[in-house]
């Protein structure tokens, strides 16, 4: 039996969170979502996902700063962070702070599924 993949999505867009949750649950994933990166290390530590999807624009701190925090934490730094944004110019910056990959918004379902398969 295949292990259930645990996926954490940080995005302030409610529609995107709902759509990703539906898609990933159909894939058999366990999902946690957050519209804020406040206390991100605590949020992630409590859920311990297999992969994190991180939006660039969050209401409290940027996805860049949130990714830096995660990658600086020895317990959490091995969790793949997939950065997503409508701003394609941020891809190199995201990767320079530790993001493992980048998805350009809007993305199709297969791109989301491929990231799960690639990193989990």
Regions found by a protein language model. Name each.
Residues 82-84:
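Hydrophobic/aromatic residues positioned on beta-strands within the core alpha/beta folds
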């Amino acid at each position: 039996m295949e292990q259930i993949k645990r996926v954490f999505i940080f995005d302030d867009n409610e529609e995107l969170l709902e759509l990703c949750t539906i898609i990933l649950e159909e894939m058999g994933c366990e999902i946690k979502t957050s519209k804020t990166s406040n206390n991100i290390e605590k949020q992630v530590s409590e859920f311990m996902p297999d992969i994190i999807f991180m939006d660039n624009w969050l209401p409290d701190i940027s996805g860049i700063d949130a990714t830096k925090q995660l990658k600086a934490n020895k317990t959490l730094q091995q969790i793949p962070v997939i950065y997503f944004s409508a701003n394609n110019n941020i891809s190199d910056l995201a990767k320079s702070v530790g993001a493992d990959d980048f998805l350009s918004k809007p993305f199709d379902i297969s791109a989301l599924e491929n990231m799960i398969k690639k990193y989990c």
